[in-house]
Curated annotation (Swiss-Prot):
<dbReference type="Pfam" id="PF02911">
    <property type="entry name" value="Formyl_trans_C"/>
</dbReference>
<dbReference type="InterPro" id="IPR001555">
    <property type="entry name" value="GART_AS"/>
</dbReference>
<dbReference type="InterPro" id="IPR036477">
    <property type="entry name" value="Formyl_transf_N_sf"/>
</dbReference>
<dbReference type="InterPro" id="IPR041711">
    <property type="entry name" value="Met-tRNA-FMT_N"/>
</dbReference>
<dbReference type="InterPro" id="IPR037022">
    <property type="entry name" value="Formyl_trans_C_sf"/>
</dbReference>
<dbReference type="InterPro" id="IPR044135">
    <property type="entry name" value="Met-tRNA-FMT_C"/>
</dbReference>
<dbReference type="Pfam" id="PF00551">
    <property type="entry name" value="Formyl_trans_N"/>
</dbReference>
<keyword id="KW-0648">Protein biosynthesis</keyword>
<dbReference type="GO" id="GO:0004479">
    <property type="term" value="F:methionyl-tRNA formyltransferase activity"/>
</dbReference>
<keyword id="KW-0808">Transferase</keyword>
<dbReference type="InterPro" id="IPR005794">
    <property type="entry name" value="Fmt"/>
</dbReference>
<dbReference type="GO" id="GO:0005829">
    <property type="term" value="C:cytosol"/>
</dbReference>
<comment type="similarity">
    <text>Belongs to the Fmt family.</text>
</comment>
<protein>
    <recommendedName>
        <fullName>Methionyl-tRNA formyltransferase</fullName>
        <ecNumber>2.1.2.9</ecNumber>
    </recommendedName>
</protein>
<comment type="function">
    <text>Attaches a formyl group to the free amino group of methionyl-tRNA(fMet). The formyl group appears to play a dual role in the initiator identity of N-formylmethionyl-tRNA by promoting its recognition by IF2 and preventing the misappropriation of this tRNA by the elongation apparatus.</text>
</comment>
<dbReference type="InterPro" id="IPR002376">
    <property type="entry name" value="Formyl_transf_N"/>
</dbReference>
<feature type="binding site">
    <location>
        <begin position="110"/>
        <end position="113"/>
    </location>
    <ligand>
        <name>(6S)-5,6,7,8-tetrahydrofolate</name>
    </ligand>
</feature>
Length: 311
């Protein structure tokens, strides 16, 4: 049985971890995940999906704010793990930790060397890519730059958003890891170096990127909305108040960027730099997420054709 240390945080990571837990060839000695966070207005404490899964299986849990230089680092290097598996962990692994194991493998949600970094799924959708994928790669000190063990791809559908693609890639990543790891460990599968000249990056989404630019084409704004749903969520402004936009549909029509060009009891169409978008699901400031029909029956009632949002 191969003894592993697992490192990751979101549901993507938990899906990969569950695959390892269900496989009798592997024993998970411990998991390293982000600290619990206070979320929402009530500041409720929320544990990570990886921690929740570890709790259910009685696995030791380590939650350093920063792994390098921590007491937890000393503890996990002494666990006697054969190897490390990471998936959406979000921190560099200290040399001390890498040197303590025979192998360290990362499950990364892009087709490397494209989209190294923390938000590959967001950028794949926002950039209008036709496919996304997962790469199994060796861990080195440089971010997502290790040799490639295996890759798998899947089409990005017009109906996909970050949430749906996240779920698809988690399953692909889980299966790809379990399929390739035995051959990698036996030496049958030889890792291939990345072409570093082709590397692109996907840094974490900044607050500035969340704001919609109505001068873009309707396809670009549509992709941007999908690439921010369900987090961190794209927004525009209505009378100085933030209006989050979760879903929209491509529409025909012309007008000034951000201008209301159609308003009925059931629809609100906004012009973009080229074409238009029909808003489907929105969230006004201080309100819950709602359908465009509910919005037009409430705060949106005062909007008129010709008004411009986003200012």
């Amino acid at each position: 049985m191969i003894k592993l240390l697992f490192m990751g945080t979101p549901q993507f990571s938990a899906t990969v971890l569950k695959g390892l837990l269900d496989n009798p060839a592997y024993e998970i000695l411990g998991v390293v995940t982000q600290p619990d966070r206070a979320v929402g207005r009530k500041k409720d404490i929320k544990v990570t999906p990886v921690k929740q899964l570890a709790l259910e299986h009685g696995i030791s849990i380590y939650q350093p704010e920063k792994l390098s230089g921590s007491q937890e680092l000393i503890e996990i290097t002494g666990l006697g793990a054969d190897g490390i598996i990471t998936a959406a962990f979000g921190q560099f692994l200290p040399t001390l930790l890498l040197d303590s194991v025979s192998f360290a493998i990362n499950v990364h949600a892009s087709l490397l060397p494209k989209y190294r970094g923390g938000a590959p799924i967001h950028y794949a959708i926002m950039n209008g890519d036709k496919e996304a994928g997962v790469t199994i790669m060796e861990m080195i000190k440089e971010m997502d730059a290790g040799d490639v063990v295996a890759k798998a791809s899947t089409p990005i559908l017009e109906t996909d958003n970050v949430g749906t693609l996240f779920e698809k890639l988690a399953i692909i990543g889980r299966d790809l890891l379990l399929d390739s790891l035995p051959a990698y460990l036996s030496g049958e599968l030889k890792p291939i170096p990345q072409d570093h000249s082709q590397a692109t990056f996907s840094p974490n989404i900044s607050p500035e990127q969340e704001k919609l630019d109505w001068t873009m084409s309707n396809q670009e704004v549509f992709n941007h909305i999908r690439g921010m749903n369900p987090w961190p969520v794209a927004h525009t402004f209505l009378e100085g108040q933030r209006l989050k936009i979760y879903e929209a549909q491509l529409a025909e029509g012309e007008g000034l960027p951000g201008q209301v060009i159609v308003k009925t009891k059931k629809s609100l169409v906004i012009a973009t730099g080229q074409g238009a978008l029909s808003l489907i699901v929105v969230q006004p400031a201080g309100k819950p997420k709602m359908s465009i029909i509910d919005f037009l029956n409430g705060i949106g009632r005062k909007l008129e054709v010709g008004d411009i949002i986003g200012r």
